[in-house]
Amino acid sequence: MVISNTTNSIATFIPHSRPTLGDEEVRAVEAVIKSGYIAEGEAVKQFEQAFAEKFGVEQAVAVSSGTAALHLALLAMGIGPEHEVIFPSFVCSALLHAVHYVGAQPVPAEIDPLTYNIDPDDVQKRITARTGAIIVPHMFGLAADLDRLLKLDVPILEDCAQAVGGKRRLLQRDDMFGSDLL
């Protein structure tokens, strides 16, 4: 979305977030592009290994986008056309696309106006017999209220794209797909 700046008549983006990339990141991307391997190759293997080591997991798999990651996770959870998937109304369109890709019915829920995370009270009102999952992004690095969401007894898919490396507390649960703010 753009707004018009009447002072000097230039279009300006509404501030949301800006990338913070430095020369080191630019050089790394340039090296990958010049290698001829932008989808696979040594850089991707190194990234996957470093990511897995950083978070103490056996494997990490790089995919082409957040949409692809969510799509694969929903498939792994067995979500399909017979399901509804609850997700926050204020979120990147990748969630909605992933839900559509598996044929499930998207069900938007309200957000907490202070954290921009999904509102557990509103989620509870939207649960039906067809609810197969709740997608829970941790917005702007703020952890969503998983304690309350877990009590709803619906499988949860955490979207940690905005909270990589964040800490909440370690949970070992069979009804969660994803990890603790990885």
Model feature map: region roles:
Residues V29, F51, A69, V85, ...:
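Generic structural signal for small/hydrophobic residues in well-ordered secondary structure
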Residues H83, S89-V91, E110, C160, ...:
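Nucleotide-sugar donor-binding loop of glycosyltransferases
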Residues M1-Y37, E42:
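N-terminal "arm"/small-domain region of PLP-dependent enzymes with the aminotransferase-like
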Residues D112-L181:
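Active-site phosphate-binding strand-loop segment of PLP-dependent enzymes
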